[in-house]
Structure formats: structure tokens, C-alpha cells
Amino acid sequence: IFIGDEAVMVVDTQATPAMAQDVIRRIREVTPLPIKYVLLSHYHAVRVLGASAYFKEGAEQIIASRDTYDLIVERGEQDKASEIGRFPRLFRNVESVPPGLTWPTMTFDGTMSVWLGKKLEVKIAQVGRGHTKGDTIAYLEDQKICFAGDLVEYQSTAYAGDCYFRDWPTTLDRLAGFGF
């Protein structure tokens, strides 16, 4: 979560709107600023199915790389059914997920920036294929803070069902080159 002087950005939405509401409540403990932006680090259901909760909260944009958007078009419904079926423990209050999909409203190729007011620029980049072909990072360059989605896992084995084994090491090298 990035909190600027005028707005908030959430990276990944949680697996269900009910779970997203928990995040929204926690954000409200810290700031009353509007949650204007949601960034999807990739297309997997556990990261995107909570998106509708942010629209209800007033989010203006759901941002995804063009490759992530294309994967949602190609596999979104299938991934939704598959992940809910295979990993029900990850989808608390699954009944809160609305029918269909909540779509990104803004896509990008390569890089983009979002200003959360006058003081905080969040840089967004698709650094290469790894966990999926649409992997996206968000970072604060000067502070050396990075959200890398599932490109980087901590004390966990990465899910590799959609990965690009040959590309992933190069993508991680590129990510390491940012100096985070």
C-alpha cells in the first residue's frame, strides 16, 4: 500500500471482496485519504478477485500491464474457477465475489508513473516474464521500496503453473539491477 499526500494506491486486491474489506479497514486506521488506484501485479485470482470492493470504496483506476489484461481476457474466468476449486482456504467468504470479472480500467506497456499527490510518485514497470507473462512491480525509487508481486517469494515455494522458467532468472536479475 502506498499512501501519498492526496491519495492511496493498493497493490493487489486480495482473493475476495470480503478480504479486501479487511485491508480497507486497516487503511482507514492509518489514513482517510481516498483509495484512488489499485494495481494488479499479475492476473491470478488470489490477487484480483477483491477488486470490486475498491470500486465500491471509490477507486478511480484499476491498473494492469497489457499482458496481464490479455491474460485476464484469455484465462480469467478459467483461473477464477480453478483457483477457487483448488485452493478454497485462500478464498475466505468466496460468496462475496461477484459474478464475472472486475476489469482493469487502465493498461500500460513497459513503464508508467502515478502521482499520489504532489509529493509521492509510484513508478510501475513490467520487468519481464517470470511468475506470469504480465508480472508488474511498483516502487518508490528514492526510498528503495518495491512491491514485486509473486516474482519474489519469501519462505515459500513459488507457484509455477503459468511461469516462464527460462525467463524468470533474467527477470530477477533485471529486478536486482534496480538496487532495492
Which residues make up each language-model segment?
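Active-site neighborhood of phospho(di)ester-bond hydrolases with catalytic His/Asp-centered motifs
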Residues: V11-T13, K36-H44, I63-R66, V127, ...
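Cap/insert and terminal regions of metallo-dependent hydrolase folds
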Residues: Q14, A18-A20, Q155-F180
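Conserved beta-strand hairpin/beta-sheet module of binuclear metal-dependent hydrolase folds
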Residues: I1-R26, T136-D150
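Loop/turn elements at helix/coil->beta-strand transitions in domains of secreted/extracellular proteins
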Residues: E6-A7, L33-K36, G58-E60, K119-V122, ...
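Active-site HxH/HxHxD metal-binding segment of metal-dependent hydrolases
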Residues: R25-S113, K133
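Solvent-exposed loop/turn segments at secondary-structure junctions
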Residues: V8, A15-A18, Y43-V48, T68-L71, ...
